[in-house]
Amino acid sequence: MDPLVSIIVPVYNVKPYLNRCVDSLLGQSYQNIELLLVDDGSTDGSEALCDEYAAQDVRVRVLHKKNGGLSDARNAGVDAAKGEYLSFVDGDDWVSPYYIENLYRALEQAGADFSASCFEEVFEGQPVQSVPTERLEAFEILSREECLRRILYQEGMEVTTPTKLYKRALFEGVRYPVGKLYEDIPVAYEVTKRAHKAAHIANRDYYYFQRGSSIQNMAFNPRKLDSVRHCYALMENVKRDFPQLSRAAECRYLSNVCNILFQIRDKQHEKIEKALWQEVKKYRRNVLLDPQARKKARLAAALSYSGYAMTRRVYEKTQWRGKK
């Protein structure tokens, strides 16, 4: 019998999307699953909908808890999970029928510690593009170092917690930082560092739903600096543990700083704006001279020598359009 996979779904006020998410998980071709719906203090009826699913399907368990945020909900799910493997799906996303099967087969055949699939981004209010769903045909086997290199250079391997299947052992002693945004970043590093190898599949089995109210689409506020802090810590950890990837870590850090910097639109955050610009100036030379760096990062580094105003003007006009 296939081993038990625990699928952890944090739920907070996502009632309009929850049926789509849960139905896609209960319809998996891989049958030996437990679905942990972690109700993080919902008030829109999501909590009752979770209970309805638990009453209808023995594979569903519901954890009701006080609101503590995404990290706290994920941690509660990890603590309660009974499976040998863990997977995470956000409550407004959904997956293909072969999502877990493809991830598990790749992991098993590769002898990997975790596997990752690609995703299809879906924007609120826009039609969903049809993506063929199929069983696994091929996958890549990545060493720990190559996996980390791709994360840092953003070459198809994401830091996001969803889209992956993990051996439970990777989470022994690892939990998400409570009260912080962009909590995926530090955990992605810790589990990758513990893994001997990973399997990466090209199937786009995960549908990542972008709502207008999502963190990524929110206007700048100082809490978004959590992303910069996480990426700085990531860079320092990589330089300590994998010095051969130092340039890659600097590239990731500069990309992150630019992403947050150019979200700032008003004068009340001028001090933050100036501090982030100093970070760009500090790392731009190394990124510019790194032939493996993303084109976006090298473009930002090169433009920065023309001054902040020009760099920002080009960014706002193009969003580095067409560059990778």
What is each residue range found by the language model?
Residues A55, L70, T160, A248, ...:
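General helical secondary-structure elements
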Residues M1-S227:
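Nucleotide-sugar donor-binding/catalytic module of glycosyltransferases
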Residues R204-G212, M218-L245, N259, Q263-N286:
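Catalytic core of nucleotide-sugar-dependent glycosyltransferases
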Residues F171, V238-K239, L303:
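Hydrophobic alpha-helix position signal
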Residues A112, D266-K324:
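Membrane-interface aromatic/basic loop that binds lipid-linked glycans or pyrophosphate carriers
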Residues Y253-C258:
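TPR repeat positional signature
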Residues Q244-R252:
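All-alpha amphipathic helical-bundle segments outside canonical DNA-binding/catalytic cores
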